[in-house]
Amino acid sequence: MATIVPCSLEKEEGAPSGPRRLQTEIDVDANDSGNELSMGGSSSEGDSMSHHRGEHSPNHHHQDNHLGSGPPPPQFTGSLFDTPPSMIQSPQQQPQFQFNTGFGLGLPQDSFRCSVCSKSSTIGVLPFVCAHKTCQSCYQMTPSSYDRRACKLCGAVSTATANFTSQMYLSPTLPSPPRGALMSDCSTPTMNNHINSSTPLHQPRAFSFSLSGMPGSPSPVMGARMPSSAGGLMMRPIGFPDSDSSLTSWSPLQQPSQLSINNLSSIGGHQQQSPMLMQNVFDSLAVNDDTPVFSPLSPTNTSMHMPPSLMASPDVPKHSATIAPPRNSMCSTPRLQLATPMSSQSQQTFPIPSPLGSQPQQQQPMGPIQCQGCESKISFAYCMQCQEALCIHCVQAHQRVRATKQHAFVELQQLMATLMSRAVQPQQAQQYTQNVGGSVRQALGSVGSGDVFFSGHVSGVENDSIGSGESSPRSSSVCGTHDSVIIGICENCPHSVLLCAICVAQHPGKHRVQPLGDIRVAVGEVVNESQLLQWQCEKTGDTIKQIIDGIVTNATTAENEIRAAFDTHVNALEERRKELLKRVETVKNLKLSVLISQAESLQSKQIDLQQAIQTATKLMDSSDCDEMVLRQVFEKLASCQMGNEGTEPNNNILNVLMLACQVNEDDRLKFTAPQDGILLNKARQFGNIESGPCAKNSSIVGDSFKKAIRERQTVIYVQLRDACGDLLSSSIAATQPTSQALLPHQEPHSHLEQAMPTSDVQAFVISPDGSTVEVTMTPRENGIVALSYYPSIEGSYTLNILVKGTPISGCPTTMDIRRGRNYDEIAAKGPILTFGKEGSGDGELCRPWGICVDQRGRVIVADRSNNRVQIFDKDGNFISKFGTSGNRPGQFDRPAGITTNSLNNIVVADKDNHRVQVFDENGMFLLKFGDRGRAVGYFNYPWGVATNSHNAIAVSDTRNHRVQIFTPQGQFVRKCGFDSAYFFKNLDSPRGLCYLPDGQLLITDFNNHRLAVLSPRNMSEMKVYGSEGDGDGMFVRPQGVVIDPEGHILVCDSRNNRVQVFASDDMRFIGSFGLGPVPNSGFQMPQELPAPYSSLGGPFGAPAFSSAPTPLTPSPRQLLDRPTDLAVGPDGRIYVVDFGNNCIRVF
């Protein structure tokens, strides 16, 4: 990349008056490949020098035709850039080499060859940084114009992403270069940020920069062909009159000064003029030759992104002044303010920014800033990534290191101009000025935050001197986010955000956008973006139609599959039914045949026996019966009893006796169905329909998310349900990146691709200042999605959760983020209020234990020794009471734990009655459950109670060393903990209970001096925290426990006479309070408290050996005496039961 350096404008000795020459120097950077470009004094002459002195040199040719005999051109020893042979020999350039006449005069006047379709045309577009133009018909092909990123012939990149000014274009200098404008100012029509080139009104000239000679040697300058007063031609730059003109010289060793060019035409006026008006100015500063050059912006050139005046050089720049295109944005693409000619009689001053140029004299001057790298030289530029001001040598060293090679720099002059333009008050500008020497992070913001530096409105004075009356910045700057032209500024945003066409489409809220610069350019950019969005809507509509057709097709397929599956199973059941019926028939027939055969045999034997018996009876009754006849009767009877007629010895096994006494079959025939209805349950759950999450039926779990703490990770739980209202079996698929693109057949534009959803579930959190907060999604079981974010400021945040682009139930909603509680301040200040004293009257307490705050903000206290429950307002004023001593419903015997559920019902552990009672919010008895015993559902001194969001009741069964869970109606659900003396007690006399936000149950293990956490999914697994002691995180007889609105765990460390605070996520110790205030803090013990209860001095009612209780860990600043329970009100107040002092402390 080259830097054009005008040094001076003066008369040349010995030359006639009129033509003047501009001495130029070029500061050249070495590319990454190691090929350094030669400057004056280089030893590489030979071919390069003969090439510049050839007869086809444009300089030589031009001077012979127009200037006649003039001074010989200087000697040049190389070109600034090298053109690859593949580019010279490309198919689109080969036909043009035959017109070897220089300046492109041999090419037809009004035609060029399209690089895509190879057709000749007169109007085209320069979409890339090479010379290969594209006709408008090829360029406007949709959507290919959005997909092209590099030239198909040479690989050059797009002009929109180049590190070069959009008003100046360097093409490869070919013997016959392409026609069309090689320059364009901000009024040039653009299409998708590409230069729209057309045939110029006057003869164009291709040009390149080539250098040689010693620094300061004269160089030929091509001027515009203008008639002089003598009627001849004179050579001078456009905008420089015949009178003496000069440039103020600047040296890095001198003080910063304001550079100016006298009598130069104003910038910013007459936008309707030809876009070629600046060409003559650059032509006058350029040396024309036919040396092939290559754009520094091509992919083969990896020069750094930095201002031209910061290009690497062996030493401090030798030139006396530098003209660097001022950059209008933080992006690395420099932009040049354009000058349009005005009347030659106009005498104006054009201030040119110098590298160390300060603000105008009206602004407060800034002293030299020391380099933050070497700390020995004056700073020259500011690294946007390192956030450091560096000198020129440190900048060069920055570019030699691979890790910092691609860092972007901004000159301090431009940086200060931008900061001053942002400053609303002089004090703020002074602060910015001071921050540059130290840390400008606060002034600049983080790199990549989307802020765009706009140097066009440095100050009102400078705008008046530069512009032509326009008060708004020029629209030639580029958006640092989308690399698109800035077209407007938001009037509603706090910092007047600069917007490109893409930013306007993505800008949140209905803000008013004021166009900048040429309104035609702004409208054109918005039209281009609108056309892209229109095309996107059309493609999305086509996709919706495809999805609708897919839904209908998939529904039909699912119906057919359901019918087929059920028919298959029904057929199988029918076949089984037929088989079982056949088996029944077979068994029935067999059994019946056997029994019928046996019955027939028995009937035959019976007849035979009957006849034999009758014959024998008659013979026996007759007196004249001879012996022979009787013998025959005997044989007949014996034959009938023996059965078979066979003579085998064992043939009479089945004799008549056995036939008569035993039945050959039974009636056993029974159908056995599947056990426990397994098949029936499976049939009822047969199959499943997967349709994904439905926004209408999905919702946020609970409402605690509406209040969160600043600078603390906050988690929101979302319950996903399908279209039928059923829980999703898994939420993993809904939070994973989708594999189906929104446009299946077209590759979208880059910013449209970023706007596409990557999963079914999307969550957006907008902070009070309008910025987006990063949200992390984590899938859980049963369709639960955990959304976590980190609020950094206080205020009202907006939450919107989308399922497939549709807000879920209850969204969008607001969340109140506030500053977290400081427990160190609570410990230092002590209690803000104390109420209650020893006694049995209304508002008086006797050894209270449990406490809770209901949904109405009332404070409910279990007055244990008075066998009642008292209700107070938030300030401790007595409201009502209920309960008396006894064992009937509504009566108590030393009530202990107390809590409320979501229905605002009051749940009380009636300790010595070994039961739990439930009351409504007015104290009316509802139900009771439990009795003394060891079986499930029975208690042995229940102590603490807790309820969750489902109103399940957890009870600490102290003497049974377990915790039992019940339904809201008192039905037993499960237990945890050992209740046998033969096992080690993992819970030893549990006391306090509370449910954590994630559903886990937190228990104070009284005799083990620790905390236990049980998971609701597996009650047999338990985590324990803490041990016995008086250090932080250690306990002695812990009792009550509660969760505050910020998620902190508060534990009553009873015998240490304090309350300890822990983080719920990792049980990290945060602080403690409850001791007396620091001396001289202004706090005094409340006077209404009586002396310690003398009759009961031991802990928890044990016989006393002295008149006053003696704590286990005495403290000189003791305030609490064995705190037993605590509760947190909706306003954040902490109510602590001071057991030993028979009162309630409020913090």
From Swiss-Prot:
Residues 33-47, 84-93 have a biased composition (Low complexity). PROSITE patterns: FILAMIN_REPEAT, NHL, ZF_BBOX. GO terms for cellular component: cytoplasm; P-body; ribonucleoprotein granule. NHL repeats lie at residues 832-875, 879-922, 926-969, 974-1017, 1022-1065, 1107-1147. A zinc finger (RING-type) spans 114-155. Disulfide bonds: none annotated. Induction: Negatively regulated by the microRNA (miRNA) let-7 which causes degradation of the mRNA encoding this protein. This requires a let-7 complementary site (LCS) in the 3'-UTR of the mRNA encoding this protein. This is Protein lin-41.
